Amino acid sequence: MMNISVIGCSFVGLLNRLRLLKLHPGVRFFIDASAGSGNRAIAAAVLHHLAQVKPDAIVVLWSGINRIDVPMPADWHNAYGAEVSFRKIQDQYWYHSGGFSCGGFYPPTPKILIDYFKSQHLGGTPEYFTDVSMLDIIGTLAILKTQNIPYYSNFIYDVHADYSEYADILFDKPLEHTLGKISPKSHYCSLFPWDQLDTQNTPFEWAKNQNLLDTDQFHPTSDAMHAWFEQFVIPKLDIQPPSNV
């Protein structure tokens, strides 16, 4: 049985494990999705899977450049935490500033975290957010490259595009905290391994061009996400047919 870990934000949550199993007998998919997750928490989840799950292949979909994650210990979470906008990894609770729904900026997220997220976004620059995301992504991709296992890596959207006007049309408010654009002024741009990402085939742009976005006009439909996954991800994973076929 081949084990494949699929890690990311709410886009990954659109994939159904049983549906994938029917299409790919002999493959066990571990779907690790956390709505609103930023790239720091996604990086932590990838390392957790490498160390604990030990998959035969990994799929990682990076999320918004401008999203912020902060880890909190279990005792703090049990005393003050909320059952929203976080990803649990071992004894760490990674709280997210939020994605499409901006969950981390409002109750029941604890006020101390709301204030922290707001201070980050009020004071942050495009270079700051790019640096923070790139640090985690560069390090994680470097580790993946050394593991000698197949992997697929991409962003959920085109990080070189400016979606501020698109967000204004949908919600009459900017979504820069949700998405964000890579700043070419980042200290780490020259180190970023673009050749390790399939950035020409991001799921948001693919679904948008195919007119397969869900009613929120941000997420692909579940069927669209599965179609994108089969077309662009599966061929990169060197999946072997079951031994009894």
Predicted regions and their residues:
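Serine-esterase "nucleophile elbow" of acetyl-processing enzymes
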Residues: 1-52, 221-227
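Alpha-helical cap/lid subdomain in secreted, periplasmic
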Residues: 47-245
